[in-house]
Amino acid sequence: MSMLRLQKRLASSVLRCGKKKVWLDPNETNEIANANSRQQIRKLIKDGLIIRKPVTVHSRARCRKNTLARRKGRHMGIGKRKGTANARMPEKVTWMRRMRILRRLLRRYRESKKIDRHMYHSLYLKVKGNVFKNKRILMEHIHKLKADKARKKLLADQAEARRSKTKEARKRREERLQAKKEEIIKTLSKEEETKK
């Protein structure tokens, strides 16, 4: 059996693949051995004596299955961990994500006129100062602030109404007293006139 090293090299060059991927027909070795140019190799490829082997399957099914399991939290216990908690999920990244979420919420609330710019600024600084652990707590805080503001406004309005009411009542009382005084003075003056 002759060595077909040259033919294999030429075939790999023509087929544009590695020498491992070239299949030479073992029943037609003599004919293949006679081919010593690229043109002849091309003819043999056309005839089917030289074939490019298909790509070996490297399945990712198991890998996909494991990835899905890891998303559920499987294979992620203490025994599987190599790095520190900070190496696996950096605190800085967690902080940045939280800041972006909370600041986005504040911006959205300000744009939709749910909070005014003064409240926005004070809450922004509180967010920066690590007051709110997550979005839910910030939203609850905003609702509470708004409720307190509304309650204060209501109480102020009620107090104002009460003040204006007492003012009106005092004014009416003074007017009545004044009218009574005038009446008494009139009657007294009439009596004095009749006596004379």
Swiss-Prot record:
Stored InterPro entries: 60S_ribosomal_eL19_sf (IPR035970), Ribosomal_eL19 (IPR039547), Ribosomal_eL19_CS (IPR023638), Ribosomal_eL19_dom (IPR000196), Ribosomal_eL19_dom1 (IPR015972), Ribosomal_eL19_euk (IPR033935)
Function: Component of the large ribosomal subunit. The ribosome is a large ribonucleoprotein complex responsible for the synthesis of proteins in the cell.
Lineage: Eukaryota, Metazoa, Chordata, Craniata, Vertebrata
SUPFAM superfamilies documented for this protein: Ribosomal protein L19 (L19e)
Modified residues (Phosphoserine): S13, S164
Chief place where the protein resides: cytoplasm
Phosphothreonine modifications at: T187
Biased composition range(s): Basic and acidic residues: 159-176
One of the record's GO cellular component terms: synapse
Post-translational modification: Citrullinated by PADI4.
Protein name: Large ribosomal subunit protein eL19
Alphabetized UniProt keyword annotations: Citrullination, Cytoplasm, Isopeptide bond, Phosphoprotein, Ribonucleoprotein, Ribosomal protein, Ubl conjugation
Top-level lineage group: Eukaryota
